[in-house]
């Protein structure tokens, strides 16, 4: 009984981040609001996300003195706030750890802001890997 109570307390006090490893065919359904935004088609997003995070929402990469978070690899230098970079501009007005769960709503809102301000080439993988020959990034099931 004591272990059950302990487990219950731990689960209440420390909710688990629900991470998700998406597939190429799951992402278009979740990212449908991104299709065409800023002139970027879904296959370009799917390709870019694959090459930046491997479709894994819990991807964290230390990069050039900053840290990039989640599916879209959003940087703590400018876009989100974390304990490592208290000087972040936090343009998306969000905690970086929000980009590590399976709810992509806030990720997409921030990615759209990045796209508006920086363009698709903010994501370095896009130009060399995802700007042409996108057939392989379409899901045959759709």
UniProtKB/Swiss-Prot annotation:
Under Gene3D superfamilies, the record lists: 1.10.530.10
Source species:
Canis lupus familiaris
Q: Choose any GO biological process term that the UniProt entry carries and state it.
A: lactose biosynthetic process
Its recorded name reads Alpha-lactalbumin
Places the protein is found: Secreted
Q: Where does Ca(2+) bind?
A: 98, 101, 103, 106-107
Which interval of the chain is the signal sequence? 1-19
Q: Which family does it belong to?
A: Belongs to the glycosyl hydrolase 22 family.
Q: Which domain of life is it from?
A: Eukaryota
Q: Could you name the Gene Ontology cellular component terms for this entry?
A: extracellular region
Q: In which tissues is it expressed?
A: Mammary gland specific. Secreted in milk.
- Aminoacyl-tRNA synthetase found in the keyword field: no
A Pfam family that the UniProt record links to this protein? Lys
Gene Ontology MF annotations: calcium ion binding; lactose synthase activity; lysozyme activity
Function field: Regulatory subunit of lactose synthase, changes the substrate specificity of galactosyltransferase in the mammary gland making glucose a good acceptor substrate for this enzyme. This enables LS to synthesize lactose, the major carbohydrate component of milk. In other tissues, galactosyltransferase transfers galactose onto the N-acetylglucosamine of the oligosaccharide chains in glycoproteins.
Q: What sequence ranges are listed for the domain C-type lysozyme?
A: 20-142
Which pairs of Cys residues are joined through disulfide bonds in the record? 25-139, 47-130, 80-96, 92-110
Its assembly, as annotated, is:
Lactose synthase (LS) is a heterodimer of a catalytic component, beta1,4-galactosyltransferase (beta4Gal-T1) and a regulatory component, alpha-lactalbumin (LA).
Has the keyword Iron been applied to this entry?
Answer: no
Q: Which InterPro entries match?
A: Glyco_hydro_22, Glyco_hydro_22_CS, Lactalbumin, Lysozyme-like_dom_sf
Q: What is its main location?
A: secreted
